[in-house]
Amino acid sequence: GFMKYIGPLIPHAVKAISDLI
């Protein structure tokens, strides 16, 4: 997931979902 690079600014739930993208 590309969201991981943005950092802890994003809730874990969103990071988990972005991991599927």
Swiss-Prot record:
It comes from Kassina senegalensis (Senegal running frog). Shows broad-spectrum antimicrobial activity against the Gram-negative bacterium E.coli (MIC=6.25 uM), K.pneumoniae (MIC=25 uM), E.cloacae (MIC=6.25 uM), P.aeruginosa (MIC=25 uM), the Gram-positive bacterium S.aureus (MIC=6.25 uM), S.epidermidis (MIC=6.25 uM), E.faecalis (MIC=12.5 uM), and the fungus C.albicans (MIC=100 uM). Has no antimicrobial effect against P.mirabilis (MIC>100 uM). Has relatively high cytolytic and hemolytic activities. Its alpha-helix has considerable amphipathic character. The lineage of its organism: Eukaryota, Metazoa, Chordata, Craniata, Vertebrata. Keywords: Amidation, Antibiotic, Antimicrobial, Cytolysis, Fungicide, Hemolysis, Secreted. The keyword Secreted applies. This is Kassinatuerin-1. The keyword Cytoplasm does not apply. Transmembrane segments: none annotated. This peptide was also synthesized without its N-terminal amidation. This modification decreases its antimicrobial and hemolytic activities. GO terms for biological process: defense response to bacterium; defense response to fungus; killing of cells of another organism. Expressed by the skin dorsal glands. GO terms for cellular component: extracellular region. It is found in: Secreted. Its main location: secreted. The modification Isoleucine amide is found at I21.
